[in-house]
UniProtKB/Swiss-Prot annotation:
Keywords: Cell inner membrane, Cell membrane, Magnesium, Membrane, Transferase, Transmembrane, Transmembrane helix, Ubiquinone biosynthesis. The gene is ubiA. Signal peptide: none annotated. GO terms for molecular function: 4-hydroxybenzoate polyprenyltransferase activity. One of its GO terms (cellular component) is plasma membrane. This is 4-hydroxybenzoate octaprenyltransferase. It is an enzyme of class 2 (transferase). It is a multi-pass membrane protein. It holds the Pfam family UbiA. Catalyzes the prenylation of para-hydroxybenzoate (PHB) with an all-trans polyprenyl group. Mediates the second step in the final reaction sequence of ubiquinone-8 (UQ-8) biosynthesis, which is the condensation of the polyisoprenoid side chain with PHB, generating the first membrane-bound Q intermediate 3-octaprenyl-4-hydroxybenzoate. Its EC number is 2.5.1.39. Its cofactor is Mg(2+). The keyword Cell membrane applies.
Length: 284
């Protein structure tokens, strides 16, 4: 495997689900902030920025977890923990990607740039929260959802209350899907003394996931309704609700394969909401 392929794996470009889980909330925000008519330049900036920052986050995560990943079945072959990439290289990759991302938003307003600094700090510190915070997935939800206030700031030069409520919804969504993800690694994480929501929720993990989905979908529906979205948005939300119910059938047995499949399927939940938002603005 050549160096380029190793870097490709380091930043998880071979696993785009993480990019999509960041991108959908950002797109919801851009469409709502612009009344369904987003600027194509802004769309390009935020889409590329999402890819770059998620990639930087993966590099930082592998650096921070290099002494733990070797003991987890799913992560044992990651480039840093396996010694194929040096920790210093991972840090340099993360720094380069973060700088590129910041360069992208340099032409935007001051508020957006200020929020981007907060986003970088949150993304960079997330891996360490897993060591002492009982539900680190909540912090992940802030990191994965910071494109929401940034999107509103870029379009409106302000961040309305609705944007913060969407961010709260994204926190609950992240707790839901990343708990499914954590259920895959629960036994390994227990041995390592790591803290995850799957461990914290214990035997109530499935109920907690479904509760988080309910809060997520409820908050998003309320925000969309306040923005005048109706029929097609409601249809998208109905499909998203169906996705959440389907996830219950996948995780209720707590089997690794089912939990991982549920995690990956969240792409379609986010896409359904986005599709409903776009169609509602188009068909009026």
């Amino acid at each position: 495997m050549n160096r380029l392929q190793l870097y490709f794996r380091l930043v998880r470009l071979n696993k785009p689900i993480g990019i999509l889980l960041l991108l959908w909330p950002t797109l919801w925000a851009l469409w709502l902030a612009s009344d369904g008519k987003p600027d194509w330049t802004l769309l390009a900036i935020f889409t590329l920025g999402t890819i770059l920052m998620r990639s930087a986050g993966c590099a930082i995560n592998d650096y921070a977890d290099r002494d733990f990943d070797k003991y987890v079945q799913r992560t044992v072959d990651r480039p840093v923990t396996s010694g194929k990439i040096q920790p210093r290289e991972a840090l340099l990759v993360a720094l380069a990607l973060a700088l590129l991302s910041f360069a992208l938003i340099w032409p935007l307003n001051t508020l957006t740039k200020q929020l981007s600094i907060a986003a970088v700090i949150i993304a960079g510190t997330y891996p360490y929260f897993k060591r002492f915070f009982a539900i680190p997935q909540a912090y992940l939800g802030i990191a994965f959802g910071f494109g929401i206030p940034m999107g509103f700031a870029a379009v409106q030069n302000t961040v309305p209350a609705a944007a913060w409520w969407l961010l709260v919804a994204n926190v609950f969504w992240a707790v839901a899907y990343d708990t499914e993800y954590a259920m895959v690694d629960r036994e390994d994480d227990l041995k390592l003394g790591m803290k995850t929501s799957a461990i914290t929720f214990g035997r109530h993990d499935v109920a907690a996931v479904m509760f988080c989905y309910a809060v997520t979908l409820g908050l998003i529906f309320i925000v969309g309704w306040q923005y005048g979205l109706r029929t097609w948005f409601a249809a998208g939300m109905l499909i998203a609700t169906g996705c959440a119910i389907y996830h219950y059938t996948l995780i209720r047995a707590r089997e690794r394969a089912g939990c991982f499949a549920a995690f990956r399927h969240n792409n379609w939940l986010g896409a359904a909401i986005f599709g409903g938002v776009v169609l509602d603005y188009l068909i009026r």
